[in-house]
Amino acid sequence: MPPPTFNGTATIRGLPRITCPHCWESFPAERILWITEHADFFGDPMLGPDHQQRFLPTRFTVDGEAIDARGFSCHSLACPKCHLSVPRSLVELEPLFLSIFGAPASGKSFFLASMTYQLRQIMSSVFATSFSDADPLLNQQLNEYEESLFLNPRAQEMCSLASLIRKTEEQGELYDQVSYGSQTVSYPRPFLFAMQPQPGHPNSEKADRLGRVVCLYDNAGESFQPGKDVVSSPVTRHMALSRALFFVFDPTQDVRFRNFMDDGSTLNDQMRGDSQLRLSRQEPILQEAAARIRRYAKLRQSEKHRRPLFVILTKYDAWSHLLEQLVGEDNRSEPWKPIGQTQSGERIHGLDMDRIERYARFSRHLMQRACPDIVAAAETFASHVTFLPASAVGWCTHPGRKDGQLYMRPAEARPFWVTVPFLYALARCHPGLIPVLKRQGATS
């Protein structure tokens, strides 16, 4: 049966313009499509036979839901360009695009799963800010990663890290295929999270203005090889739209960093025992990402990107002794402190920007000594670069006696600073959403 043909304008209360998180098209709210419900309309011309058709309605229920040609109430929305689904939260809240990338085996997927799980635990209780899935279907794989790490039924058993989370693929379930006539385009699926201040937040009265839908894109390291970003597979073009970029750098993969650690004599059990440990150059990934962003953002070669770049130094548990010597402390506490409390007596915390920036300065100093080309590549590309340490699981990994792989008991995972790059980026890019401590020496 042909798709339902309606003429007219759909009116939805919310933002005047909406940005699709899949194809990044910006369009007036009245152009948004609805997804049919009746089985007669199975098979969309752009998405294929397994998807319900999209349409622009003229009839609505008293509750504002569109009505398809068979009289069924519709509940889901879609982009008028790519026809992929758009969560309702993006109709009401502005998007905040963030991109995370890194070399293969850099620990990016572990970091991402650990970060989002910890954000779910702390955002409401610590910062009086909601943090929830804006689209549970799009976030399904990330939720599975979180469960494997932190809600594993085998939590007390020794599990290989390779069995807990699989590497990010270039194609598959994290991509959507859309047909534009004879041209098929593969779009990367974002992870979507809705955030808003809650009662008790210092800016709770500005919840509608400060609220955001975080659109987080995870890029496979292989996507940054030459020829991997083309019209039919625009896998990294969202990076030019991102308000912040996160480059995951694994110091234990860098031979210079390992040589910097007393010729390997201070390597911990993780680095000595992991037979799967790769030694690889990671700066080409950063340089290729920078080149693509310059091209898509139309930046001159001499012009710096004005959006902040965060270099996340992963597997901190393997090299923490180096930074602790520079910082002068081995404090593994989170960088926030109470600043007040709600009417119900719950504490509200503020992010300790001074402490974070102190760790960032010493992290940069360490990288400048061990891997100066990474520092140069980052600071040549972006005007605001921050180096931060993080460990996705903490000090709980052990090499296997037989195969040399790394093992851990999921119950023993104690992440270090995995939320800090995200929280610090929000504080810098979107002031007001994350409460912060008053700066030392600042005047009121």
Residue ranges of model-derived segments:
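Flexible phosphate/Mg2+-sensing switch loops adjacent to catalytic phosphate-binding sites
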Residues: L90-V91, L119-T168, P435-R439
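A conserved segment at the C-terminal end of the G1
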Residues: F111-Q121
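Canonical P-loop GTPase G-domain recognition
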Residues: P49-F60, A318-R428
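Long, basic/Gly/Ser/Thr-rich N-terminal segments
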Residues: M1-E92
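Conserved lysine of the Walker
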Residues: K108
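Conserved C-terminal guanine-recognition region of P-loop GTPase G domains, centered on the G4
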Residues: Q198, D208-G211, S233-G350, Y359-E379
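Hydrophobic anchor at the beta1->P-loop junction of P-loop NTPases
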Residues: L98-I100
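Switch II of P-loop NTPase G domains
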Residues: L84-S85, L93, S179, P188-L245, ...
